[in-house]
């Protein structure tokens, strides 16, 4: 098999092309934007919108998810789903997270959904990226990588997490349904 071939071939460029095993073989545009700050929040809200309305939301200029303000790595967003407005925040860096938590505890702000990524700009600027000291933490380079992910999303055949066949199979065969007791127990964090 392929494992045996890999062990015998030192030049990996000579390995035959093949598809990834499930569940990693199929990707969605929503999954790709997970790599940028705000991407997980946006992908989750796309699916929430579909769950409530039965329709996929517009993406891009016509999206119901609106950026209200952006200051550095902090974005404040809002989405209206059938008359229910959700106030959201997306930020990157643990220092930003600490400041937001303190402001929320003091009652200075309220958010229904907060996404925090530890690395500035998100995973696109994280430890899994090639180490290039001239690149790290440069906002323009992070913005360029963000735009690459967004372009991939725009050109993806499947743009919504809930349309990923592997995710659908996982719910059908193991988690029962979104928000089921089993899914809630395994996937949701109440406190940490």
Describe each PLM feature range:
Residues 10-13, 18-48, 53:
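A conserved mid-domain beta-alpha-beta active-site/ligand-binding segment of alpha/beta enzyme cores
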Residues 161-192:
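Short flanking/linker segments adjacent to small metal-binding domains or redox-active Cys/His motifs
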Residues 31, 35, 39-45, 56-95:
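Accessory "access/gating" subregions that flank catalytic or transport cores
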Residues 12-18, 54-68, 110-115, 160:
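Flexible, glycine/charged-enriched surface loops at secondary-structure junctions
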Residues 113-131:
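Local cysteine-cluster metal-coordination motifs and their immediate loop/turn environment
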């Amino acid at each position: 098999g392929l494992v045996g071939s890999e062990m015998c071939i030192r030049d990996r460029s000579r390995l035959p092309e093949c598809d990834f095993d499930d569940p990693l073989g199929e990707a969605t545009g929503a999954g790709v934007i997970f790599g940028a700050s705000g991407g997980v929040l946006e992908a989750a809200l796309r699916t929430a919108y579909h769950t409530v309305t039965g329709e996929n939301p517009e993406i891009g200029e016509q999206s119901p998810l609106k950026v209200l303000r952006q200051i550095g790595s902090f974005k404040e967003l809002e989405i209206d789903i059938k008359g229910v407005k959700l106030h959201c925040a997306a930020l990157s860096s643990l220092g930003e997270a600490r400041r937001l938590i303190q402001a929320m505890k003091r009652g200075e702000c309220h958010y229904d959904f907060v996404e925090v990524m530890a690395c500035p700009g998100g995973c696109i600027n994280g430890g899994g990226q090639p180490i290039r000291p001239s690149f790290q933490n440069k906002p323009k380079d992070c913005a360029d990588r963000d735009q690459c992910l967004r372009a991939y999303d725009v050109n993806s055949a499947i743009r919504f997490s809930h349309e990923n066949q592997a995710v659908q199979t996982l719910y059908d065969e193991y988690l029962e349904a979104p928000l089921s007791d089993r899914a809630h127990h395994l996937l949701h964090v109440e406190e940490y």
